[in-house]
Amino acid sequence: MIRLEPMNIRLPDSRIAVSVLTTKPRTVVVPHGPLSFVAYQRELMTSAPDNAQLRILAQVARTPSSPAVAMANDAWAIRSVSVDLTVAPVPESREMVELQPLNPDLVLSPGRYVLVFKNQAYDFVVAGKVTDRAHCLERAETPDGDRFTECRNLP
């Protein structure tokens, strides 16, 4: 079992495609493979939520005029791309719940994620080489503000 620490970040609504940027360094690395989570909080006895989410925490790259992509000072953004989790009580302890993907066969691709539980974010990294472009965003500065798109090529 690996303990996840809460992030000090305000979570955006899940309908917002890209959150404000964070520069919090990666903390916890979990092995690639099936995952489930256990949450312990005393108030879960009386107020456990019905669901939770895993959301992608994408690394942000700048889009320069050249084809090369430069990473933007280790900036990360929470995406709206998510996996829904079920919340079920742990029979041995009423203060604990187990969080599992709706699809029991789901294996997360390598990259950084945020577990969203009770409006709190907990980040972790699934070990391995990132191959899913959803984990990389290009940021282009425009007169109307920054625009984000998935990276055409992974850095």
State where each predicted segment sits.
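Residues that flank catalytic or metal-binding motifs in active/ligand-binding sites
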Residues: 95, 109, 120
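Extended, solvent-exposed segments with strong compositional bias
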Residues: 70-98
